[in-house]
Amino acid sequence: MKKIAFFSIPAHGHTNPMLPVAAELVRRGNTVRFYSFDVFENKIRATGADFVSCDAFLGNLTKKEEAGLKKVSTTEMTIQDIRITLQMDTFLDGEFKKFRPDVVYSDSVCFWGKLNAWKHHVPLVVSTSTFAFNRMSSRYLKNSLKETADMIFGMPKIAKELKKLEPCGYNVKNALSLVQSDNETDSVVYTSKRFQPYSESFSDHYVFVGPSVFSGTAPSKEKERPLVYVSMGTVINDRPDFYAKCIEALILYIFIYINCRAYGTV
């Protein structure tokens, strides 16, 4: 049996898909140690995994600052992740020497998980909660003028922060190498291959498994009907207009293809 270290960022949309994976690995007799944050402790322990709190490495935020995270730029978010990695360095050095994981399973944007896997020469498997990103992504990702400017002017700032990682044994070419998928790293992607843009450009190291939902309560389904799962991430979940459009689209689809009136009250 293997010892597996899980790493994720403090976000529901990135942590939740990893929970069924942890539960299945534990069920098969593996030891899973999940490095996460206190808000997820109960969910993680429910999988049978060991929970390790990383809250001490996050700054204390006021309610106003916490709300402001939803508007933070890509540059600021990247720099913050690099700084958290530096703050966790001594702690994770000790954890890797003590736990000695056989595999690291890290969220795709959890820098401290990926960087420590590379630093300690432990095989890495990447958990991708959205689409996988590679060189083809620029063909369908349309950045606003503000986002483009942020990337252009933010690169020197990020490069400066990356330099601070070198004395700690982290060798990083550039920021893209931290977030962009490569065809040599084993990756689990929580969408279907049909929904992944340019899926043919990804190697066999990628497994597209579809939505991953972990819950002790199964949805009530008195009738054998399809289940529609709609989910947004932590950062942009407060979007009632989006959910309303999903409901509207579903109702329109049903009435176009099915004569619901023939079934009585819907």
Give a label for each model feature:
Residues 76-80, 157-164, 227-234:
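Short, basic, glycine/proline-bearing loop/turn elements
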Residues 86-87, 107, 168-172, 212-216:
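Short gly/ser/thr-rich secondary-structure transition/capping motifs
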